[in-house]
Regions:
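Sec-dependent N-terminal signal peptides
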Residues: 7-18
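Short, charged, surface-exposed loops that flank catalytic or proteolytic processing sites
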Residues: 178-184
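C-terminal segment of classical bacterial N-terminal signal peptides
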Residues: 19-27
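Short, well-ordered beta-strand elements within core beta-sheets of diverse protein domains
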Residues: 172-178
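N-terminal secretory signal peptides that target proteins for export/translocation
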Residues: 1-6
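A structural signal for well-ordered alpha-helical segments within the folded catalytic domains
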Residues: 169-170, 183
Length: 258
């Protein structure tokens, strides 16, 4: 019965994603999927994300070897977005990641520069068993973003700030290089949101063998993180799905000014 439920659900997902892709032209188009472990035949949670584009956005898998960045090394993200900067707290963990197949000879297709940063990193798993699925672009309410603007290059210039917020494509690199558990990865990302903010809103999964967390931020520094249970399903096509939550629940972490 569980297998039948999942097959029907995945069939619906494929039809929905195909319909959504058919109406999408040159836009951020992704669909995030979560199926709790109780609804999966193998008994483990199912986390996925489709990119609803044509074949020119096929993916290439890579491995970032352990120690690529040493403790104290300075990371500079893609100049196209600011860029975000980070000093590694320890030698980086080994992790897998994938990028678009338009990444040639070390040239980043986003900024056109030959740089050390990874181009549009979306998903990966590190040697500690931590997985991150990111780049589910969201859109914040204009009234909210006026009160808590995105910490992008324009904001940094207007506020004379030397740092900008994290861009969604840098999230997998930083979390997978640094975090030894899902909980540690969640704390790190939320600390970054609080201290540096974000360039744009997004939805992010951070999980390991024990926990699956889903984080949404729809303005510069505000966020909600929820530890997902095993009896739920959700499908998210570039839209925030977290609604009313109990901020006192031990499975919910929210920014203090939310």
């Amino acid at each position: 019965m569980k297998g039948s439920v999942l097959k029907k659900f995945l069939c619906t997902c494929l039809v929905t994603a195909a319909a959504f892709a058919a109406t999408t032209i040159s836009a951020s188009a992704c669909t995030t999927i979560y199926v709790g472990g109780d609804l999966v035949e193998e008994g483990t949670p199912f986390v996925a994300r489709t990119e609803d584009y044509g074949s020119d956005y096929n993916k290439l898998w890579f491995i970032s070897e352990s120690g690529k960045w040493k403790q104290g090394d300075h990371y500079v993200g893609c100049p196209e977005y600011g860029p975000f900067e980070w000093d590694f707290t320890h030698d980086s963990y080994r992790f897998t990641y994938f990028t678009n197949d338009i990444y040639y000879d070390g040239i980043c297709p986003e900024c056109g520069e030959k740089a050390d940063h990874y181009s549009y990193t979306e998903f990966g798993t590190n040697e500690k068993g931590v997985s991150v699925s990111a780049t589910e672009t969201l859109y914040g309410n204009e009234k909210v973003t006026e009160a808590d603007p995105y910490r992008d290059a324009e904001w940094a210039e207007a506020n004379k700030s030397e740092r900008i917020g994290i861009e969604e494509t840098d999230i997998p690199t930083i979390i997978l290089a640094e975090a030894s558990s899902a909980r540690e990865g969640v704390k790190l990302l939320l600390d970054i949101y609080e201290n540096y903010g974000c360039v744009y809103a997004s939805g992010v999964f951070i999980c390991d063998k024990d926990e699956v967390w889903y984080i949404e931020n729809c303005s510069g520094t505000q966020y909600v993180a929820i530890k997902l249970n095993d009896n739920m399903i959700f499908l998210e096509p570039n839209m925030a799905v977290i609604g009313r939550v109990d901020l006192d629940d031990e499975n919910v972490i929210a920014s203090k000014d939310l």
